[in-house]
Design a protein with these regions (language model features):
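Bacterial N-terminal signal peptides
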Residues: 10-20
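N-terminal secretory signal peptides that target proteins for export/translocation
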Residues: 1-8
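N-terminal secretory-pathway/extracellular module detecting exported/lumenal segments
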Residues: 27-105, 109-294
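Cys/His-rich metal-coordination motifs, chiefly Zn-binding "fingers/knuckles"
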Residues: 23
Length: 294
């Protein structure tokens, strides 16, 4: 088989999976679903007509939504269904992953907290028969490691039209704060996720990704943390996060300052990051203050 044919089939298979899924969902529940993304395990959709503002407060320019509800759908390939069944620990209910076709869920979103919470979820087979249902889930903050991040962005965009989904997909979503290489060849690089950035008074709050590579270029440490940087004072603190090493895998991030602010010293690589953050906050002030309430 030629390279071109193999490549063409590789592109065609996810598309055929999507085509096979969409008519079934539309025929069974009558909703108009909008496609968000697909990979070899999952296809994500949301129902624009289902989006409702359920709570708001008065702001300077009018009411500001503080709670939004909507419906989302996830389509499963065999591999995606198998992974989902294991994650939900429902193998005793759905024993054959081939049965699980898609799930429809009701979610509640808070734009100010950047959170999404499932209020109900139902799993179906290809004929639309219910396989399993669950009630309210845990409220989760959205970031690059969350499966539901695109759902959150699409629902918020339906109300505010501020480009949440576009920022998730932008080439410059992650910006370099600083990088530094030691004489031994060990290199550290820190990037910031602009899609998560919010300015709360003097603090710029966001999620950051730190990678440490050895002289051979192999990743030996990763930190993924939410941090608050006081821009005028030049201090920062870690709010929460996790840490990975080749020896220990992923672990909760232990911050030696126990959540307290620490000074960003002058002349350090971290100071370059502070300068970058100040420039971003000034240049994109409308973005970092979106959805704020008095």
């Amino acid at each position: 088989m030629s390279t071109k044919i193999r490549y063409g089939l590789g592109l065609l298979m996810p598309f055929l999976f999507l085509l096979a899924l969409c008519p079934t969902v539309l025929a069974e529940d009558g909703r108009a679903w909008t496609w968000l993304s697909s990979n070899d395990k999952y296809s994500k959709f949301y129902a624009p007509a289902s989006v409702r503002v359920t709570s708001s407060v008065a702001g300077a320019g009018g009411s500001v939504a503080t709670e939004i509800t909507g419906e989302i759908k996830t389509g499963f390939s065999y591999e995606g269904a198998d992974e989902t069944i294991r994650n939900y620990k429902i193998g005793h209910v759905i024993q054959n992953p081939g049965q699980l076709s898609y799930a429809v869920a009701q979610v509640r979103v808070s734009p100010q907290k950047r959170t999404l919470q499932y209020t109900g979820e139902t799993f179906y087979d290809a004929a639309g028969h219910v396989l399993w249902s669950k009630g309210e889930g845990t409220e989760k903050e959205m970031n690059s490691q969350q499966f539901d991040e695109e759902f959150y962005a699409a629902i918020v965009d339906m109300v505010f039209h501020r480009g949440e989904l576009a920022r998730l997909r932008a080439d410059d979503r992650w910006i370099l704060l600083w990088s530094d290489e030691m004489a031994s060849g060990v290199k550290t690089q820190v990037t910031a996720d602009t899609s998560t950035m919010r300015r709360v008074r003097d603090n710029l709050v966001f999620w950051a990704w730190t990678e440490v590579r050895n002289a051979d270029g192999k990743v030996v440490e990763i930190k993924f943390d939410k941090r608050a940087v006081n821009l005028p004072q030049g201090t920062e603190r870690i709010v929460t996060g996790k840490y990975w090493s080749s020896a220990g895998g992923w672990q909760p991030l232990e911050d030696g300052y126990e959540g307290a602010y620490r000074m960003i010293a002058r002349g350090t690589p971290e100071e370059r990051g502070l300068v970058r953050l100040r420039a971003f906050a000034d240049g994109y002030s409308t973005w970092v203050t979106r959805y704020q309430i008095p």
